Amino acid sequence: MSIGILGKKLGMSQFFDDEGRAVPVTVIEAGPCRITQVKTPTNDGYSAVQVGFGDVREKLVNQPAKGHLKKSGEDLLRHLKEYRVDSTDGVELGSSVTVDAFEPGQKVDVSGDTMGRGFSGYQKRHGFSRGPMTHGSKNHREPGSTGAGTTPGRIYPGKRMAGRYGGTKTTVKGLVVLKVDSERNLLVVKGSVPGKPGALLSIRPAVRVGAKATA
């Protein structure tokens, strides 16, 4: 696998392709990220690269983290992320990972936390159909049957019910990179990504590439 990059979701916009079709896109402020640790099979048992992103006040970083970050540079970083790689040859501690690592037409996998929607009902959380709204019905947004009675006498684990919705980590795979802006550290990808504007994202080359991507 290749080294990924951390970024921040700025928001959504749209592009128009050569045929005049509107294409929804997401603008991501990606990097630059500093390589804070290089793991090798000799020392750690596997190959990986840890990168850091985002400024942070010194008083918010504990002493062990400060000592760890000082090995790769003077600036403290808010977020750390480790990426498994096949080999760490040519990777230097303290060097930067920028959006130049990606190119238009490339497919990427974007990971992040989905927007939290709080305690939600059956229709919103699971897409259940509602009951009749008229003719004396009192079952508008109720769940319906949740199982049998005396036997089994309980609710089976995994039963879809109301509860907390969102706020979970997810990965959107195979998004196409449409534009790379090296001067402003911007990455424009086709489609939507998890989270609200300002959310932390992890972008890495797609694991499953498939056919050649087209904008």
From Swiss-Prot:
Membrane spanning stretches: none
Cellular component annotations (GO), alphabetically ordered: cytosolic large ribosomal subunit
Lineage: superkingdom: Bacteria
InterPro entries for the chain: Ribosomal_uL3, Ribosomal_uL3_bac/org-type, Ribosomal_uL3_CS, Transl_B-barrel_sf
Keywords: Ribonucleoprotein, Ribosomal protein, RNA-binding, rRNA-binding
Coiled coil: none
Pfam families to which the protein is assigned, alphabetical: Ribosomal_L3 (PF00297)
Biological process according to GO: translation
Listed GO MF terms: rRNA binding; structural constituent of ribosome
Location of the region described as Disordered in the Swiss-Prot/TrEMBL record: 124-164
Similarity-based family: Belongs to the universal ribosomal protein uL3 family.
HAMAP family documented for this protein: Ribosomal_uL3_B
NCBIfam families per UniProt: L3_bact
Functional summary from the UniProt entry: One of the primary rRNA binding proteins, it binds directly near the 3'-end of the 23S rRNA, where it nucleates assembly of the 50S subunit.
PANTHER family found in the cross-reference section: 50S RIBOSOMAL PROTEIN L3, LARGE RIBOSOMAL SUBUNIT PROTEIN UL3C
Subunit structure: Part of the 50S ribosomal subunit. Forms a cluster with proteins L14 and L19.
Name of the protein described by the UniProt record: Large ribosomal subunit protein uL3
